[in-house]
């Protein structure tokens, strides 16, 4: 009886070729494809996996789990790798790994295979997560093992009649989920080349966007968006709704050269229309609901959390601790944020909360002012005392300094 390998199957070039490669190595292949909100035709993927030679194919709808257990932390934690990339692909990898391990244990497979190259981040994310969840499982990386170029891989697919939606003229590598879309390879590898129109799918060119704006009010409960214009949505449906609405306005395009975990720089094109709107609105609500010290310290945690996610360390004690901190900060992040969507921009123009720390009577410069300005004299004297003492001792600062 042949040993079984569970393959993370997407229906794309790498994993389609990997099915045949694993069969040639003497394994039975159990394909596993997750829906994390990318809108893929899963019936087609299922049939394609079987046509490629897989003995079984599991199709798992994990969209709700992805939004509730993973994207929720991207929102509450304002996760942005290098202050630019909202960890789109990285965020789905721990969930995919979790499901692969569950299928491997269910089918008595000896290991798990993925279609990642030896140059990317995903190989690290998958393998570290799998070993964290079940150290006994073997991990196979066919693409890394055979060492082919993208062109050689395409040629192999053509020779073996493996249908893939890719060719030498359009060799993009695309990954998409609920939180956004990532695109690389081909002409995009030249960091000076402008991305062609066919590199985008979720967002319109600015020239093709409406000439009138849309204005929406997003309601948040404990850090998460729950309704738009008083219409309630589950989180996954709310994100998909905003992907459509904001994408129509050309919002969410990111052209980024990032520092990969494996030590190289990579040019990536991201489309994150819903994420951009939600994160801007969430940050705006935090400005009136978080205390000054929390608001100033939270970005330190956010940066570390984003790096943990990007670097494949979702299943780790540190990430568990970071989640607890983030959750504790969101207890009062409840309220409404008004956002205007127009010509590539999501602009916050209003925010309110029953837990707002903004006191209009203290902030106003009108006759309603309740701020005790006389108290400023003593505050300034004490606040500036260390500076004054230092200048008395060392002679003060000259104008040249």
Curated annotation (Swiss-Prot):
Sites where the protein binds L-aspartate: 117, 121-122
InterPro entries linked to this entry: Arginosuc_syn_C (IPR048268), Arginosuc_syn_N (IPR048267), Arginosuc_synth (IPR001518), Arginosuc_synth_CS (IPR018223), Arginosuc_synth_type_1_subfam (IPR023434), AS_cat/multimer_dom_body (IPR024074), Rossmann-like_a/b/a_fold (IPR014729)
GO molecular function: argininosuccinate synthase activity; ATP binding
EC code: 6.3.4.5
Binding site for L-citrulline: 85, 121, 125, 173, 258, 270
One BP annotation, GO: L-arginine biosynthetic process
UniProt keyword annotation of Disulfide bond present: no
UniProt pathway annotation: Amino-acid biosynthesis; L-arginine biosynthesis; L-arginine from L-ornithine and carbamoyl phosphate: step 2/3
Localization in the cell: Cytoplasm
Sequence positions that bind ATP: 8-16, 115
Record GO cellular component, one term: cytoplasm
Source organism, top-level taxon: Bacteria
Broadest EC class assigned to this enzyme: ligase
Reaction catalysed by this enzyme: L-citrulline + L-aspartate + ATP = 2-(N(omega)-L-arginino)succinate + AMP + diphosphate + H(+)
Keywords: Amino-acid biosynthesis, Arginine biosynthesis, ATP-binding, Cytoplasm, Ligase, Nucleotide-binding
Complexes and interactors: Homotetramer.
Homology family: Belongs to the argininosuccinate synthase family. Type 1 subfamily.
Protein name stated in the entry: Argininosuccinate synthase
Species this chain originates from: Staphylococcus carnosus (strain TM300)
Source species taxonomy: Bacteria, Bacillati, Bacillota, Bacilli, Bacillales
